[in-house]
């Protein structure tokens, strides 16, 4: 059952009760870092995820039944960096204090640009800033139709203050921006060219948590009404079966908003997102633990939907046991509420 509630902005950050249970999922529901898109020609849903050289599946609705198609890029990426052969194995990933430990070919972001389906993916290696965001395209998303275009030009090394993974493309009235980043100085944004295939100019920071390990990643920008909402994952993502984080330090989904797509994001208390601001949208509750790796999808029947991965504590805490979750979002208070 799906439900929603409305709270005033000052109370929103403190709301920890009343989260709706994740929406139904049948078929292939084990997933990490999902990205959701709907094909224009027939309304079929496609879902991309980390692992297996970008695994993807399809369904007739967001609830499923989800059928695995296979690897998006079975021959790997043309980006010449460690990790382009997709060695990430979710079931054996463990948290070691470094961001995205063992996650090497990851975090897809599916978008449609001028009638062509784009999937942006990340190539990286264990705890490294030697990372890049790549692009693959298809006109149908059918198996075997993907063309790998290699790097978008968004790359990082140890000389940078960011990590070039977790890309998310945003179309602001025909102007494209790539949001990206994980730990270090957290979330950055870079203008893209008009085809959304290559970076056009230098990046700049849009979200940063100065505390602790700067545990911010997986940003997703979504416009609703007059505001741009910057969703992101905060906390420890992985390895819960072998090393459970302190209560409250596990993954959760936060948000800031702005009247501009390019900065000045604040939370419900007015704290800048570049200074540790962030209002909780979804966190651990009931049998849901560590929700994150999120995106927002405008469903033709349901409206705005928050989708993510999570651990069902009744099943198990291993990374390979994480499930696809989704909830309808209520923006009636001016802030997204599950």
Swiss-Prot record:
Gene Ontology biological process: arabinan catabolic process; xylan catabolic process
Alphabetized UniProt keyword annotations: Carbohydrate metabolism, Glycosidase, Hydrolase, Polysaccharide degradation, Secreted, Signal, Xylan degradation
Record carries keyword Secreted: yes
Pathway this chain belongs to: Glycan metabolism; L-arabinan degradation
Catalytic residues of the enzyme: 33, 217
GO terms for cellular component: extracellular region
Site feature Important for catalytic activity, responsible for pKa modulation of the active site Glu and correct orientation of both the proton donor and substrate, where: 166
Reaction catalysed by this enzyme: Endohydrolysis of (1->5)-alpha-arabinofuranosidic linkages in (1->5)-arabinans
Known EC number: 3.2.1.99
Signal peptide positions (record): 1-20
Family: Belongs to the glycosyl hydrolase 43 family.
PANTHER family listed in its UniProt record: ARABINAN ENDO-1,5-ALPHA-L-ARABINOSIDASE, ARABINAN ENDO-1,5-ALPHA-L-ARABINOSIDASE A-RELATED
Protein name: Probable arabinan endo-1,5-alpha-L-arabinosidase A
Organism: Aspergillus terreus (strain NIH 2624 / FGSC A1156)
Phylogenetic classification of the source organism: Eukaryota, Fungi, Dikarya, Ascomycota, Pezizomycotina
Gene responsible for this protein: abnA
């Amino acid at each position: 059952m799906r439900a929603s509630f409305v709270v005033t902005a000052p109370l929103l950050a403190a709301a920890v009760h009343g989260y709706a249970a994740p929406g139904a999922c049948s078929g292939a529901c084990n997933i990490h870092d999902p990205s959701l898109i709907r094909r224009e020609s027939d309304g079929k849903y496609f879902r991309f995820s980390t692992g297996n050289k970008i695994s993807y599946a399809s369904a007739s609705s967001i609830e499923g039944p989800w059928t695995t198609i296979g690897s998006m890029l079975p021959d790997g990426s043309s980006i010449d960096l460690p990790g382009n052969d997709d060695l990430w194995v979710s079931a054996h990933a463990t948290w070691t204090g470094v961001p995205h430990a063992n996650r090497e070919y990851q975090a897809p972001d599916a978008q449609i640009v001028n009638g062509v389906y784009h999937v942006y993916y990340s190539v990286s290696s264990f705890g490294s800033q030697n990372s890049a965001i790549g692009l693959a395209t298809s006109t149908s998303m059918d198996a075997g139709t993907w063309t790998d275009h290699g790097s978008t030009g968004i790359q990082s090394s140890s000389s940078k203050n960011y990590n070039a993974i977790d890309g998310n493309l945003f179309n602001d009235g025909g102007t494209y921006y790539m949001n990206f980043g994980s730990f270090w100085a957290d979330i950055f944004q870079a203008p893209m060219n008009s085809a959304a295939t290559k970076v056009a100019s230098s990046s700049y920071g849009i979200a940063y948590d100065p505390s602790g390990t700067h545990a911010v990643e997986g940003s997703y920008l979504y416009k609703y009404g007059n505001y741009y909402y910057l969703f992101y994952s905060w906390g420890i993502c992985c390895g819960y079966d072998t090393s459970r984080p302190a209560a409250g330090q596990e993954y959760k989904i936060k948000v800031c908003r702005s009247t501009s797509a390019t900065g000045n994001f604040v939370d419900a208390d007015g704290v800048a997102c570049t200074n540790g601001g962030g209002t909780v949208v979804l966190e651990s509750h009931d049998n849901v633990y560590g929700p994150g790796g999120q995106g927002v999808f405008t469903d033709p029947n349901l409206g705005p939907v928050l989708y993510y991965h999570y651990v069902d504590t009744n099943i198990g805490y291993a990374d390979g046991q994480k499930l696809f979750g989704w909830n309808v979002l209520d923006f009636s208070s001016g802030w997204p509420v599950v």
